[in-house]
């Protein structure tokens, strides 16, 4: 019983101390404050006598401020007495929304770009025009043209350079600005090439080395269009970026354009992937116009079997030779051959599958949405875009025709005849161009099987477009 009484007495004492502590602290602070005021008054008295008397207006303003309502933050708040207006609140909300931006100067451009993005989404989803990349590009275009979203800021990359000081500050930098760094620094296209290499079989090219010439011939369209773009008033860097469309290689076009003419990137990317999707429409008329029915019926012998040793040596040898002769092409060629070596060596199957699937898919999403983000109204809605689309199809047509013409020339000196249709597969739209050669060949001769023969020039075109990009980078100073 005594212990219980002792416990309650101690508890009561503790409560009294807790209650009294703030009061004691206030008393001590008040005493200290009075001492400080007295000391301050003694020091400031001589100075106050020298100063003029406070104007009456300032005294009245101070009195008003003293009697003003106090906000929750302890500061005078004159607006707290004002009656809340629902109409004003709705007006303020509408002014902050993006709807108003469509009715301001230049707002119609954003609306038009949104319509273009809807059209591209339709082509990708319904018509299946290169949907794996055209759909992310279209959605990136949609995001960047939503007024007020602030996801992409082209001024951070003005002049073709990354303004790292703005990124360091972090304020005003959107999500797509960070993702676009992968395009600007050339990371995404190279990673795409690793995946392409892991999915490519160079066996038909190794079995028939002459098909390398057909792949090289198809790149003539790049340089013909380069000259044509110069004639139309584009500068050297812009002409080089436009010409690469003729290679029908999206990652290469994006890689080169991001280096030479980044302001043309959205138009060139859309043109490149659109024309790749239109290979079955563009190529057959050209192939039929340049060949006779007899030439289209030519049957080619079955290719020899290529050993695993040859498939392992090939990517290593190609990397060494091209990197020494043309260092500017080393990033693309090196990544392409790295992926192929993973596939062919037989000891990195897990890496090969990861590169072909997970890595390829993730990078494709980032690449597409980043490229689409650059398609702002100012960058896309101009006469240059129309010129790029026109020159792009010219480049693609010249590339397809050049391969067919070289195959016809080779038949003049070769004992074993080559079906000229496989020459059009020299553009690097893998494997669509090879399938078109097979389809047109079977229309003339149902028993003709050209697919594997056409795959030789087709994969050679992948190497050729990367080499052509390296040549342009070497001759055009950044």
Feature-to-residue mapping (PLM):
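Transmembrane helical segments that form the transport core of multi-pass membrane transport proteins
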Residues: 319-403
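Hydrophobic transmembrane alpha-helices of secondary-active transporters
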Residues: 120, 143, 180-206, 340-342, ...
């Amino acid at each position: 019983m005594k212990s219980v009484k002792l416990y309650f007495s101690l508890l009561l004492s503790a409560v009294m101390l807790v209650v009294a502590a703030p009061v004691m602290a206030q008393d001590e602070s008040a005493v200290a404050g009075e001492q400080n005021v007295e000391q301050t008054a003694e020091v400031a008295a001589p100075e106050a006598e020298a100063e003029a008397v406070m104007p009456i207006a300032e005294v009245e303003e101070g009195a008003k401020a003293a009697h003003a309502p106090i906000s929750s933050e302890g500061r005078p708040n004159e607006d707290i007495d004002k009656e809340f207006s629902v109409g004003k609140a709705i007006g303020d909300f509408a002014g902050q929304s993006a709807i108003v931006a469509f009715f301001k100067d230049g707002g119609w451009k954003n609306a038009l770009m949104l319509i273009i993005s809807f059209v591209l989404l339709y082509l990708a989803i319904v018509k299946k025009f290169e949907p794996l990349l055209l759909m992310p590009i279209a959605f990136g275009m949609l995001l960047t043209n939503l007024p007020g979203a602030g996801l992409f800021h082209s001024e951070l990359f003005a002049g073709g350079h990354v303004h790292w000081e703005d990124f360091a500050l972090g304020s005003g930098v959107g999500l797509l600005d960070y993702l676009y760094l992968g395009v600007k620094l050339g990371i995404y296209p190279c990673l795409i090439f690793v995946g392409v290499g892991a999915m490519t079989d160079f066996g038909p090219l190794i079995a028939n080395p002459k098909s390398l010439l057909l792949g090289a011939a198809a790149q003539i369209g790049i340089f013909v269009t380069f000259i044509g773009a110069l004639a139309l008033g584009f500068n050297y860097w812009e002409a080089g970026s436009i010409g690469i469309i003729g290679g029908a290689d999206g990652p290469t076009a994006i890689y080169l354009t991001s280096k030479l003419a980044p302001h043309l990137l959205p138009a060139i990317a859309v043109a490149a992937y659109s024309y790749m999707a239109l290979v079955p429409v563009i190529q057959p008329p050209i192939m039929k116009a340049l060949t006779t029915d007899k030439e289209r019926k030519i049957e080619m012998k079955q290719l020899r079997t290529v050993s695993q040793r040859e498939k392992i040596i090939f990517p290593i040898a190609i990397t060494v030779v091209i990197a020494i002769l043309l260092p500017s092409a080393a990033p693309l060629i090196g990544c392409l051959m790295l992926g192929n070596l993973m596939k062919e060596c037989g000891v990195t199957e897990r890496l090969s599958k990861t590169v072909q699937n997970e890595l390829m898919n993730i990078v494709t999403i980032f690449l597409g949405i980043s490229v689409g983000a650059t398609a702002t109204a100012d960058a896309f809605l101009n006469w240059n875009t129309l010129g790029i689309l026109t020159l792009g199809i010219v480049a693609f047509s010249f590339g397809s025709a050049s391969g067919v013409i070289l195959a016809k020339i080779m038949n003049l000196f070769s004992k074993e005849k080559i079906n000229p249709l496989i020459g059009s597969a020299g553009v690097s739209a893998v494997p669509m161009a090879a399938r078109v050669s097979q389809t047109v060949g079977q229309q003339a001769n149902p028993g003709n099987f050209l697919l594997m023969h056409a795959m030789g020039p087709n994969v050679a075109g992948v190497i050729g477009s990367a080499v052509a990009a390296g040549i342009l980078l070497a001759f055009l100073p950044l």
